[in-house]
């Protein structure tokens, strides 16, 4: 299974490689890990205490999370999901296997919506930014085309019938 691109019959045909990556499992689960790191950093910064009164989240744990943020163990997560039937908890477990010192703080105080909903917002924002950038390029190229051919006469059409003269540049706008 490819994890670096989103696959469907439509995406295979019509989506750019950039868009396929934005909606890929890799992007999704790496974003989950970034969110868990951000959560741990915030809990550390705010001085969250454990039951003994010490820091609940240490910088050593955060560094361990960062060291494994990119290397997702899909096989462990897949096997764990068969057991717990929960995608978020299976990835918490898989991440914890890679980060034994930080295992207890991954997803600490969060709900599944924390990673799920925030990741959806991040992915949609990035996808819309990509569409915006590509659309700006199309508009720019169309404007260049219209200016290049602003004086080239051609016949206009209305209801598929020949009409008055116009220019190719005007027809492009």
Where are these regions (language model features)?
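A helix-coil-helix interface module used to build multimeric assemblies
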Residues: 1-173
């Amino acid at each position: 299974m490819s994890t670096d691109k989103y696959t469907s019959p439509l995406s295979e045909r019509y989506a750019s490689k950039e868009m396929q990556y934005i909606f890929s499992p890799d992007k999704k689960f790496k974003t989950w890990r970034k969110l868990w790191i951000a959560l741990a950093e915030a809990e550390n910064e705010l001085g969250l205490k454990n039951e003994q009164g010490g820091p609940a989240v240490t910088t050593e744990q955060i560094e361990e999370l960062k060291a494994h943020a990119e290397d997702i163990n899909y096989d462990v997560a897949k096997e764990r999901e068969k057991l717990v039937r929960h995608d978020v908890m299976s990835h918490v477990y898989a991440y914890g296997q890679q980060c034994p010192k930080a295992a207890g703080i991954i997803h600490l105080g969060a709900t599944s919506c924390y990673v799920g909903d925030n990741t959806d917002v991040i992915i949609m924002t990035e996808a819309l930014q990509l569409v915006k950038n590509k659309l700006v390029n199309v508009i720019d190229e169309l404007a260049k085309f219209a200016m290049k051919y602003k004086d080239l006469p051609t016949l206009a059409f209305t209801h598929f019938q020949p009409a008055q003269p116009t220019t190719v540049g005007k027809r492009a706008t």
